[in-house]
Amino acid sequence: MDKGKSVKSTKKSVGMPPKTPKTDNNANSHVDNEFLILQVNDAVFPIGSYTHSFGLETYIQQKKVTNKESALEYLKANLSSQFLYTEMLSLKLTYESTLQQDLKKILGIEEVIMLSTSPMELRLANQKLGNRFIKTLQAMNELDMGAFFNAYAQTTKDPTHATSYGVFAASLNMELKKALRHYLYAQTSNMVINCVKSVPLSQNDGQKILLSLQSPFNQLIEKTLELDESHLCAASVQNDIKAMQHESLYSRLYMS
């Protein structure tokens, strides 16, 4: 091997900007990404998130979450463990892989998530939400998602909400930190709504919980940006157990 040639080649590759997904900017000239990211994270975006508690219902029925204080502790624990290392991290990784046009890497990330998710209800929930997110975007004919997103949509077998959202955000050149912030808030808001309905809590308590989570939100986003693929799916065993126990609850309001 020519050592001089090898060093020269390496220097060229260092510092190169990531590829940008090829989208027809003119086709989306009428789309305001600021409003679009609000739309896809809104509770009325029809992917069925409201039908899942992801194990929370078990905590409530077992009297582990009974009031505002225990609901807040549950949320902090869940957000800083399973949600961080699976949802937030996979969103970031698929976002970065989309910028690199690396479809194989994205499919590999989704396979790791599927194989690492022990509870059956959580696996099914991930797939349903991911598929529904993709199909809803495709049904919006005025929105040109670009060739890479379309190739991903046709190829993926095990999409999750977070991974498909990461591909979506990168395909439309949205800022990663903004995509993470909106996703984190929207999913936490869903959890709080579930607590308000099921514990139950007052609407005011729900808003107090969301307000008190602002500082942890910023910490979670910064932590996500620091993590790499080796941390993917560092799950909470306790939450997996509760999700499995949910399958045999006598009465259930949620599918997971």
UniProtKB/Swiss-Prot annotation:
UniProt-annotated location(s): Cytoplasm
Highest taxon above the source species: Bacteria
Gene3D superfamilies in the record: Urease accessory protein UreF
Disordered: annotated segments: 1-28
Molecular-function GO terms, alphabetical: nickel cation binding
Any Gene Ontology CC annotation: cytoplasm
Chief site of localization: cytoplasm
Ranges of Basic residues composition bias in the record: 1-11
The entry's keywords: Chaperone, Cytoplasm, Nickel insertion
Family per similarity comment: Belongs to the UreF family.
Free-text function comment from the UniProt entry: Required for maturation of urease via the functional incorporation of the urease nickel metallocenter.
Quaternary data: UreH, UreF and UreG form a complex that acts as a GTP-hydrolysis-dependent molecular chaperone, activating the urease apoprotein by helping to assemble the nickel containing metallocenter of UreC. The UreE protein probably delivers the nickel.
Protein name, UniProt field: Urease accessory protein UreF
